[in-house]
């Protein structure tokens, strides 16, 4: 059994799916890890836009959104857990406090309460955010096992990839943080 000090904490890291990812849900994805502990991990897929845009989602939850640049921003598939629930990944907003927010150590915030969407609708919320439906979750030791089987690469997260890079370029951009491209990856694991 490893000591707690031996544990690697992957909070505020990107998980990048390897080509041999067997689960089609995660094939080709980049996941921002919001929390990683001995109890498990929680993250949001950041590169799978859905056909739903903010205007449609806000209409569904009876919020008026009149800020033109926001209307057609896509809502993302955040993962297969709680797909009916919204998760907002955003930069901290000075002086703002939302009902259900989690500060990610060294990084962003994730909020699940409607008040952050109300703030977005009125223009007082986070300026840089990504809204997902659902999240990715792993039980105790599950993510570590997947990483040990070469299912994921990990790298320190860069908010510019989350907020400034087009969705279809995020996978390659995240790999670029490691100095590699998808053409350099093999789906086969081996030992030297």
Swiss-Prot record:
Coiled coil ranges: none
Naming one, the record's GO cellular component terms include: cytosol
Q: Which residues form the signal peptide?
A: none
Kindly give the SUPFAM superfamilies that the UniProt entry links to this protein: VC0467-like
Recorded hits in HAMAP family, A to Z, give: UPF0301
Belongs to which family?
Belongs to the UPF0301 (AlgH) family.
**What is the official name of this protein in its record?**
UPF0301 protein Bcep18194_A3962
């Amino acid at each position: 059994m490893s000591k707690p000090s031996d544990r690697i904490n992957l909070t505020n890291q990107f998980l990048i799916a390897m080509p041999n990812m067997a689960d089609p849900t995660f094939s080709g994805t980049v996941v921002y890890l919001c929390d990683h502990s001995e109890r498990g991990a929680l993250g949001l897929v950041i590169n799978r836009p859905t056909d739903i845009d903010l205007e449609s989602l806000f209409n569904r939850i009876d919020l008026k959104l009149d800020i033109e640049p926001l209307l057609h921003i896509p809502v993302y598939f955040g993962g297969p857990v709680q797909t009916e629930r919204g998760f907002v990944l955003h930069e901290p907003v000075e002086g703002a406090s939302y009902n259900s927010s989690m500060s990610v150590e060294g990084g962003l915030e994730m909020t699940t309460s409607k008040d952050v969407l109300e703030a977005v609708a009125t223009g007082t919320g986070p300026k840089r955010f990504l809204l997902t439906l659902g999240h990715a979750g792993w039980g105790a030791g599950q993510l570590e096992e997947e990483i040990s089987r070469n299912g994921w690469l990990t790298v320190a997260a860069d908010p510019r990839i989350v907020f400034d890079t087009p969705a279809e370029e995020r996978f390659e951009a995240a790999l670029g943080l490691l100095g590699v491209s998808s053409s350099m990856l093999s789906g086969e694991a081996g030992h030297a």
